[in-house]
């Protein structure tokens, strides 16, 4: 890190955390601690292995210890709202939280995944406004992406998910998009491969917003056939470790433009950083370190 952490931690240092499982792969501690050090801010960011069973107790503990805030990742994004005091309008609409801020004992949940995804596309030179996208996934990140894309002006969104516990959540997402935005959303079963082929063929971007591709699912992909992809298609993955998932490898082989999850991670983190500190993250500096 820029400064030895022991040289800058004092009795006044405020703690910010990350709760998820698995957690050891995360680049968020590096990103935020480097940003704190660069700006001379008296915070430290630590990762905590937390799943469903521990979530309630951990939030109560964080509240009691007066943490400034924390990030939330899988599998906690759609459950943590029960233990918070308030939700931002975006988090309420999405039904998920990835950032919590503690303002004088009041815990407010925010969602920055969707804005991070759209900003990453913009920074990479991709414009999907007024166009159609196909996305796999129905968890917190996928929902945030779909809602933000719809709000930003994407014309159509086709969502694919297995008929698991998240399918009902995807049905709610489709209803929200169709009733509260000008975007048309549809939901399909992930096992309907012919429908997936059709929707990808009509889309400018295909996105994996599931954990498939990261540990313990490295080397796997939800894409049933490589010939569903075409050279002019943008293929993105929210997974950033590994930086090139099996999906992105296949996409490159098919001549597609590809985008991994690093950009989304950076820009959602920059927004969370601003929520906690009221300062702008030194994004160019962080890019040099992470990319």
From Swiss-Prot:
In short, the EC number is 1.1.1.25
The UniProt similarity line reads: Belongs to the shikimate dehydrogenase family.
Name the top EC class. Answer: oxidoreductase
Underlying gene: aroE
Q: Which SUPFAM superfamilies match?
A: Aminoacid dehydrogenase-like, N-terminal domain (SSF53223), NAD(P)-binding Rossmann-fold domains (SSF51735)
Oligomeric form and interacting partners: Homodimer.
Q: Which GO terms describe its biological process?
A: amino acid biosynthetic process; aromatic amino acid family biosynthetic process; chorismate biosynthetic process; shikimate metabolic process
Residues binding NADP(+), per UniProt:
137-141, 238, 261
Q: Which PANTHER family match?
A: BIFUNCTIONAL 3-DEHYDROQUINATE DEHYDRATASE_SHIKIMATE DEHYDROGENASE, CHLOROPLASTIC, SHIKIMATE DEHYDROGENASE
Q: Which organism is it from?
A: Listeria innocua serovar 6a (strain ATCC BAA-680 / CLIP 11262)
The name of this protein is Shikimate dehydrogenase (NADP(+))
Kindly list the GO molecular function terms attached to this UniProt entry.
NADP binding; shikimate 3-dehydrogenase (NADP+) activity
